[in-house]
Each structure stands twice: as structure tokens, then as C-alpha cells.
Amino acid sequence: MAIQEIRHPLIRHKLGLLRRADISTKNFRELAQEVTMLLTYEATKDLPVVDCEIEGWAGNVTTQRIAGKKITIVPILRAGIGMLDGVLNLIPSAKVSVLGLERDEATLEVRTYYKKLVPDVANRIAMIIDPMLATGNSLVAAIDVLKASGCKDIRVMVLVAAPEGIAKVEAAHPDIQLYTASIDNGLNEHGYIVPGLGDAGDKIFGSVQKD
């Protein structure tokens, strides 16, 4: 599995701000989108381009445009929604597919409770977005769904990842590409990434419980 931890100075700076315990919902949303934009830049560096001719202000100009495959962004509900605008700011024409996953309390297995994929998803690059890669169970399930729908080029962007989750995904799907702002130390006894970001979904949606 191709794993890239993007250690750009801007990402390091913004990630440090995201980790603050006293961060506001507004700032968390904005920083999450900004880091996502920087990850998107890296995750799309290998897209093919072709020359095309346009009429410029001083005559015809040869420029380039992205060629070939189109893209669908796949946020995992609910926290993945907080990264969506960060991708759309750079790829406004991308189509959006949505996956909702939850753990079945009886079997402890991850199940899909919501799935809305674009009709031609099999012919698109699928870019999964989710702030946290912790145990890896949800991400493995999401990739399973996309592959079952015919997707062949699957890329994942997460803000922070735990080594345990990376290992789980790599064992199940060694052919995907993973981009993250940070590979953190690991999971604590409660399954939270350390140092991590806390509950990214709560911080994005403003549902953090106050003491």
C-alpha cells in the first residue's frame, strides 16, 4: 500500500492548531478544510494532463487540462463531511458519493447503514475522506463497498492515522493509496488516537460535551 505522510510546513503548523484542546468549532472546521486542501494537492499530483489550445487575451495559448478519469469524493459520515469543502475548493466539478457506516452492537462488525454512490462510480477515481484512521475497521468496510461497486483506483485522505489502523487497511487492501497529515503514536485503551484530535466529528458539528 502506498502510504504518504505529508510533512509540509503548512500542514505541520495547521495540524498543531487542530490539536489544541480549546479550539472552537469554527476554527476546527476551517483548519480541517485547509489541511484537506493540502492533502488533495498531493493526492492528485499524478493525474494525467493533455495539451489544449484556448484563446487568450493576446491570441491563442497552449494550456493543459486534466485528462482521462473523473473523480468522486466519498466522505464517510458524519465526520468526513467536514473535509468535503476542502476537496471541492480545488476540484469543484467532482461528484460526491456518500457512505454511512456503524458498528453492529450484536456482531461488533461494521455495517453500511447508508450508501449513495454516483451511477458511474466504477469509472471514477474514488477519494475517500475521513478525519481519523483509528482501528481501520470503517475504512476497510468503505473500501469493500467501493470495490464491490467496481472501483479500481481508490485513494484515501485522513487528517491523522494510527499505525494499528494503517496495518489493518494494508492487510485488507494493499492496492490503495493513503495520504495523511500525521501518523500518530497509536491508540489508547479506549481506541482513541494519541495524540490525535479528540472526537473530530463532535468538533466539526459543534456537539462537544462541555464539562
Curated annotation (Swiss-Prot):
InterPro entries: PRibTrfase_dom (IPR000836), PRTase-like (IPR029057), Upp_B (IPR034332), UPRTase/APRTase (IPR050054), Ura_phspho_trans (IPR005765)
Protein family per UniProt: Belongs to the UPRTase family.
Cofactor binding, per record: Binds 1 Mg(2+) ion per subunit. The magnesium is bound as Mg-PRPP.
Statement: the UniProt record of this protein carries the keyword Repressor: no
Alphabetized Gene3D superfamilies for the sequence: 3.40.50.2020
One GO-annotated biological process of the protein: uracil salvage
Keyword ATP-binding: no
GO molecular function terms listed in the Swiss-Prot or TrEMBL record: GTP binding; magnesium ion binding; uracil phosphoribosyltransferase activity
NCBIfam families: PRK00129.1, upp
Job description of the protein: Catalyzes the conversion of uracil and 5-phospho-alpha-D-ribose 1-diphosphate (PRPP) to UMP and diphosphate.
Cofactor requirements of the protein: Mg(2+)
Reaction equations catalysed: UMP + diphosphate = 5-phospho-alpha-D-ribose 1-diphosphate + uracil
Activity regulation: Allosterically activated by GTP.
Protein known as: Uracil phosphoribosyltransferase
Pathway in which the depicted protein is active: Pyrimidine metabolism; UMP biosynthesis via salvage pathway; UMP from uracil: step 1/1
Lineage: Bacteria, Pseudomonadati, Pseudomonadota, Gammaproteobacteria, Moraxellales
Binding site for uracil: 193, 198-200
